[in-house]
């Protein structure tokens, strides 16, 4: 089912969408001519990841380099005195074609520069910047038929767009998919999530088996960090890891903190009047005494959200996620604090270099807020409800 594949390719788990949600996604993307007709053949694999080819030995690339096109947008957030740049992916309908770009926004000048434009019918989801600000790693699905060996894999490219993306390593088999790639702040490792929707075959399993790996960059080999887990994020000193674990039989989620190598994994207990079942995109707070994460809001009658009122738009309930808000919990566990009341889908956050602000990508737009959720300000619209990521660099 195309809608289900597109949701999975975006890195959002099946349980976040109902049957109607998959169908609405399918209809919307068919209309936009983003057709991912991927034929997956049945086979089994070993759990352990094999040794991988290095980028020097792999010639595969998505084939389209940077355009270096620039546009200017009003700096409506000038009163906040924000500095640095946002690196993000964004999709939009242009002349009946869905175009996906990796972009850079200068927060001082409002200049938007295209780093990379994906070929038609390709898909870019997760984009992460190396700590030295020189390279990008992204989760990329090539256009159907262009690379029979890749459904969704990790690619690296220079942030100046001087070379097209190069495959980080060759998937063992076509059905292996890779997403949620994060550079460790010390620059030594790339962490990522692996999933194969056909393996393992288990009639009792109602959810795919996600795994978190890391590999030294450049030239390292995959190292298994966590089973039944996704959404890896590192502390600023690269010593601790937070992620979401999920039981593929019961679909029960847990928020986890572990050592950077996956050892000493412990659940962060949540308490309060409302404990969300769906949790995504955890990130350490600037002072690293708490974890921020996206979670579904309590069930209630549908009302226009903050974004919808602001932008004069209505969002479909069937998107890559569910209406969510940012929450925080002490790193050692405790009562939840709801930071926002926006009910926006597909949230993903990054800290400002000075650790004073949080920028968040969402299916409704890109916004900035204080760490406590106050003074929320819209930066960029997302009218076509693209599911992407954002990173704030100096």
PLM regions and their residue ranges:
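Intrinsic-disorder-associated, low-complexity terminal segments enriched in Asp/Asn/His/Tyr and depleted
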Residues: 5, 12-14
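Short, Lys/Arg-enriched N-terminal segments with co-localized hydrophobic residues
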Residues: 14-25
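Bacterial N-terminal signal peptides that target proteins for export
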Residues: 24-33
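Bacterial N-terminal signal peptides
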Residues: 33-42
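Sequence signature of WD/YWTD-type beta-propeller architectures
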Residues: 43-394
